Amino acid sequence: MLDGVNLIIYGAAVSAISFFGVLFLTPAAIRSLTAKRKVVPDAHKAEKPPVPRPAGPVIMISIAAAEIVLFVLTMNIAILAILLTTAIAFIVGYIDDSRVMPGWFKPVALLAAAVPLVVLDVLHMGEVYGESLNLIFGRAYIPLLYMPLIFVIIPVAGNTINSIDVLNGVASGFLIIAVIPLLASIAI
């Protein structure tokens, strides 16, 4: 477990890695995607300017770099589980965005993203998500519920984010609003 000072230092470090990764990789990605004519009209602007896509690889590379650094610093198996879950969810989303897939594909494929969380927790005896849920009103100890709940939460969360991302930036703004109370409850 990290103490408060290291938590802040590591949090600032991984945030900086993610931020600067996106900041520096995005211009190169824009040039590359534009040169390859991988652009689509921006449906949310009146003049419909061409926008390069996909931006997901830049975001994933930046998140993965930050998570790898955090794992190396802490050697916390939960970070590795989060990295693998994020990578699998990214691959599923990338496939879903680049090809026309049937409606059932994404929710079913996102079940694979839950596997690292469950398998690494079983292999490392409670180091990934622990023995109890830390809730605002106290702790709940229901270990048999955690595994099936993870297999429900990952596909539901993935599809929810996909469905609320109707305008540029809506998903990121919504996630910031949703994460603030979550972080507060974890800190308490």
Task: Name each model-derived stretch.
Residues 2-188:
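"…together with the soluble PPM/PP2C metallo-phosphatase catalytic core" -> "…together
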